């Protein structure tokens, strides 16, 4: 048999659940890279991950590394021997490095002369001799931010390692990994099945581990089982389970043998806003809440146990007992908070610092109130409501609920505002001011909320840039990248008539003399335009399309987006490549012009080609102006694409730098007008 399945399992103490999947997939990727580097062929790699183990299985791995021919070229013959024909030191040094003498070297003739060369055949090694190093290297390259030592060992890993098993077919690969000798013994579930047992063949994994050790090693299998059983439990209770992907994967990483169970809590807790209850169920307890068909929270939840007793009553009651104090706390905080109105919490914001140089949260609230009102006027929504929402925007940070359950900020402000009798749009804006919270998150639904969300984000961006604390490298303590992208998404996707430069200027004015960066407006605008690039690249739009628009630096995001869509469309046209090249040529010609360029004079035209182009660009200049005003850049570029034929004819038949100054200036005017037409949309000369 020329191939065998290879298994490596690393048995550890409990691995960090949020890192488990990344560790496992990285381990598999690293093993694959090491095998490829060694020239070892295989069919497929499978990865396994459970709380106390990482494993990789390589299917049909070649048992022998292939032999390979190597060729090492040395110095030129002219430099390898001196005038007397003796080897030079350069030649001897090269030969020594190859393990031969100069006389044993071959010669190879090239068009640059004759060279010394050493050819050799390196015999491939048995795969079993390479696997220990392959595994060690793969583990060494895992993304482990804080490795640890244990016992008296000097090795480091993310958690202490207790067992290592490496099998090529039925053969044990002897060696030491992370200070532990490879052996056939693997460990089962901590509480179920056999504690330890031997594995005889790689093909027995992972079924043997499930049968004897009560461990489902396949991460995706456990995940699918938890999902299916959770959905079934919820359906049986007349509801739908709220199963977020991130929480599902975390729960999958916490159990070796999943046992999905349902439990309940007292209905009186449903008087508390559902978001607070869900926060503690998901965040603290790793439970899946259940909602009815109308989206109302039910007094039930689903949890996943790592043990499977015949009677689960004790486990269910235990989880109900554990969650009850947390829900009681939430109930107490909610009832206590209702005793004081949001607006009455404003003075307390003066005791909390937003940023030392930028003042307190009360200062920030005052700025948001004013800027939200300005934005509301520009986008045609209720200024008074936007200002009221801005004024109350941070008051819920002073409540007991948000202090204890920080992720409920905003949503609790909404509930408290409703209780206080605030306008519904104002209340909703208190929640939606933080949207979008992450990539792909939904946007504020109302324009009032959009005004407050934008005011908050621009205040943070302007303030932090204004004191010279722009993000550096990966460090972004004020989440400015997220704020910038969120603001851009709101403006673009809601097609709001807002200008970045104008908003930053208005925001900066509200800080008084607190800002020290004189270039804050340009810095913030450039930063936000840079986030456009990342956004569009994620959408699959080519970099040169984005650069073509960035070259014009349009500061209205909705307008910027329209230009990008237009250039992206233009790039697909048959004439795009030729016109991009022509515009590049035009740019070079105009850059060398030594005098001011005037308007086109048709009476000066001599050649038919120049007259045809002049008439075409003049006609189009008139035709596209209304389209430019409407922002219909796609139609503009579609019309300009018709210039390909007259442009090609012009460059084929007309000499721009004519001896006659009037003729030369008129031809430059034609090209200048041509370039100007395209520059009203983008600089297409940068298109590749």
From Swiss-Prot:
Pfam families: DALR_1 (PF05746), tRNA_synt_2f (PF02092). GO terms for biological process: arginyl-tRNA aminoacylation; glycyl-tRNA aminoacylation. It is an enzyme of class 6 (ligase). GO terms for molecular function: arginine-tRNA ligase activity; ATP binding; glycine-tRNA ligase activity. InterPro entries: DALR_anticod-bd, Gly-tRNA-synth_bsu, Gly-tRNA-synth_heterodimer. GO terms for cellular component: cytosol. It catalyses: tRNA(Gly) + glycine + ATP = glycyl-tRNA(Gly) + AMP + diphosphate. The keyword Nucleotide-binding applies. Keywords: Aminoacyl-tRNA synthetase, ATP-binding, Cytoplasm, Ligase, Nucleotide-binding, Protein biosynthesis. HAMAP family: Gly_tRNA_synth_beta (MF_00255). This is Glycine--tRNA ligase beta subunit. It comes from Haemophilus influenzae (strain PittGG). The lineage of its organism: Bacteria, Pseudomonadati, Pseudomonadota, Gammaproteobacteria, Pasteurellales. The gene is glyS.
């Amino acid at each position: 048999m020329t191939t065998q399945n290879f298994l490596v399992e690393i048995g550890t103490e409990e691995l960090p659940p949020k890192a488990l999947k990344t560790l496992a997939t990285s381990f598999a990727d690293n093993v694959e890279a090491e095998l490829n580097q060694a020239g070892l062929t295989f069919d497929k790699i499978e990865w396994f991950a459970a709380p106390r183990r990482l494993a990789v299985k390589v299917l049909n791995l070649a048992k022998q590394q292939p032999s390979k021919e190597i060729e090492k070229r040395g110095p030129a013959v002219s430099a390898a021997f001196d005038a007397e024909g003796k080897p030079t030191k350069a030649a001897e040094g090269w030969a020594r490095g190859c393990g031969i003498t100069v006389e044993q070297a071959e010669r190879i003739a090239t068009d640059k002369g004759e060279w010394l060369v050493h050819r050799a055949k390196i015999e491939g090694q048995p795969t079993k001799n390479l696997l220990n190093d392959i595994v060690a290297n793969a583990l060494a390259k895992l993304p482990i931010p804080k490795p640890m030592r244990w016992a008296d060992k000097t090795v480091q890993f993310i958690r202490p390692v207790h067992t290592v098993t490496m099998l090529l077919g039925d053969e044990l690969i002897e060696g030491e990994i992370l200070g532990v000798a490879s052996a056939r013994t693997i460990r089962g579930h901590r509480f179920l099945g056999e504690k330890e047992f031997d594995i005889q063949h790689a093909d027995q994994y992972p079924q043997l581990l499930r049968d004897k050790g009560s461990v489902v090693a396949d991460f995706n299998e456990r995940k699918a089982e938890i999902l299916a059983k959770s959905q079934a439990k919820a359906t049986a209770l007349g509801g739908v389970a709220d199963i977020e992907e991130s929480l599902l994967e975390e729960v999958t990483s916490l159990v070796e043998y999943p046992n999905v169970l349902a439990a309940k809590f007292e209905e009186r807790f449903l008087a508390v806003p559902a978001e607070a209850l869900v926060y503690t169920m998901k965040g603290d307890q790793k439970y899946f809440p259940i909602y009815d068909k109308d989206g109302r929270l039910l007094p039930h939840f689903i949890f996943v146990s790592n043990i499977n007793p015949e009677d689960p009553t004790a486990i269910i009651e235990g989880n109900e007992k554990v969650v009850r104090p947390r829900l009681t706390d939430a109930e107490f905080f909610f009832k206590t908070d209702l005793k004081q109105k949001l607006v009455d919490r404003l003075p307390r914001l003066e005791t909390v610092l937003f940023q030392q140089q930028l003042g307190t949260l009360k200062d920030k609230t005052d700025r948001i109130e004013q800027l939200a009102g300005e934005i509301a006027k520009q986008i045609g929504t209720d200024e008074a409501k936007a200002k009221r929402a801005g004024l109350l925007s941070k008051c819920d940070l002073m409540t007991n609920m948000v202090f204890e359950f920080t992720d409920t900020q905003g949503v609790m402000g909404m509930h408290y505002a409703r209780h206080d009798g605030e306008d519904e749009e104002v209340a909703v804006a208190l929640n939606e001011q933080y949207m979008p919270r992450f990539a792909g998150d939904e946007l504020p639904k109302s324009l009032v909320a959009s005004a407050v969300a934008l005011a908050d984000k621009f205040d943070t961006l302007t303030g932090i840039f204004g004191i010279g604390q722009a993000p550096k490298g990966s460090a972004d303590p004020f989440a400015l990248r997220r704020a910038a992208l969120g603001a851009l998404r709101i403006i673009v996707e809601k097609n709001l008539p807002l200008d970045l430069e104008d908003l930053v200027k208005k925001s900066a004015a509200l800080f008084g003399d607190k800002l020290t960066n004189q270039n804050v407006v340009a810095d913030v605008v450039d930063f936000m335009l840079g986030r456009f690039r990342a956004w569009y690249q994620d959408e699959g739009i080519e970099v040169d399309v984005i650069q073509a628009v960035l070259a014009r630096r349009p500061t209205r995001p909705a307008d910027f987006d329209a230009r990008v869509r237009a250039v992206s469309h233009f790039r697909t046209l048959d004439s795009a490549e030729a016109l991009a090249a022509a515009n590049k040529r035009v740019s070079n010609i105009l850059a060398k012009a030594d005098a001011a360029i005037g308007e086109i004079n048709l009476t000066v035209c001599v050649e038919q080609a120049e007259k045809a182009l002049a008439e075409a660009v003049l006609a189009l200049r008139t035709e596209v102006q209304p389209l430019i005003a409407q922002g219909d850049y796609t139609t503009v570029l579609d019309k300009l694409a018709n210039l390909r034929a007259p442009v090609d004819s012009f460059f084929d038949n007309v000499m721009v730098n004519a001896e006659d100054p009037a003729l030369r200036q008129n031809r430059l005017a034609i090209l200048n007008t041509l370039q100007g037409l395209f520059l009203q949309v983008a600089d297409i000369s940068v298109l590749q």
